[in-house]
Amino acid sequence: MEDQETRQNREYWFVVFAAILYGTITAGGQFFSNLGLSLYEISFYPVLFVSLILLPIVWTKRQYFIKKEMILFFVSYGLIGAFLELTQFGGIVLGVPVAIVAILLYSQPIWTTILGKLMFGELITNRKILAVSLAFLGIIFLLKPWHIESVGPITGIISALFGGLFLSLWVVWGRKSGIDKKHFITTTFGYKSFSAIWLLLLWPIVGFFIHKPNIVRLSISFPSQYWFYLLIFAVISALVPHLFFYRGIQKVHASIAGIILLLEPVSAAILAAILFAQAISFNLISGGALILFSNYLVLHEK
């Protein structure tokens, strides 16, 4: 019994570690944006690199290969991933302030708690409700939306709201892969490879509606060091955290994982302070403390 509890605690910490590493996504996105890469390039190339890195492993180790009965699952999961990439940036493109977009994206634990109940029968306890409420309050403290004069167009708001829903679906599909006992390497490869395919298929459609090169350009004419930076970014922000996340969520409920993942903006804010000399404010400290406390609540729920 003690060994089982130890193993379960280990799975929780796998998700915590993944959430912290996911915080590099924001800092990396800002870094590559400063270099002049488009949003589509920042989204697509790391996804492609993760797929290519794992391809030899999946190809030579047949136990990791995507079996025929898994294809439909990964086709749908990849589509969720592609829509997540597009909707999380769609609000910003359409003129919604970043703080509002982030708040709507991080409504994810609310959706995840509901979907976890509907799909997996996960209990919605008072402790979970309190943890979600504290975490969401922490996000509001982090982002300070009261400083914003306008929330932007309704189309951008809807896009960001759907981004939160697709982020939740990403967590829920990840949990389903764990319940179905798919290996975490298989899930990482399947999710990323099918997301890359869907991003390519959707690219001309997105380009039809959005004509800004800094959004939809997909070029290979980069200096060689940019490719190296993209490779490192893919490993740190996607490959490693995905492997830990999909390993952990084999045992961790989707609703709990959704709350733990709110450590990501705390990690992102700290990285921004270190890498881009952004100030560590009272709002960051208080918001981060609320999110950490919400994680304490779910990690110690009996």
Predicted feature residues:
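Specific alpha-helical transmembrane segments that line the substrate/conduction pathway
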Residues: 41-48, 89-123, 254-273
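Glycine-/small-residue-enriched transmembrane alpha-helix faces in small-molecule transporters
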Residues: 1-45, 87, 150-176, 201
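Hydrophobic transmembrane alpha-helices of multi-pass small-molecule transport proteins
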Residues: 54, 75, 79, 127-145, ...
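Hydrophobic/small/kink-forming positions within alpha-helical transmembrane segments
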Residues: 23, 27, 78, 82-86, ...
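Specific transmembrane alpha-helical segments of multi-pass solute transporters/efflux pumps
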Residues: 21-26, 59-99, 141, 234-252
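C-terminal transmembrane-helix exit sites in multi-pass transporters
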Residues: 53, 58-59, 108-133, 266-285
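C-terminal-most transmembrane helix of multi-pass membrane proteins
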Residues: 2, 47, 145, 226, ...
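Hydrophobic alpha-helical transmembrane segments of multi-pass integral membrane proteins
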Residues: 9-14, 40-56, 72, 133-134, ...
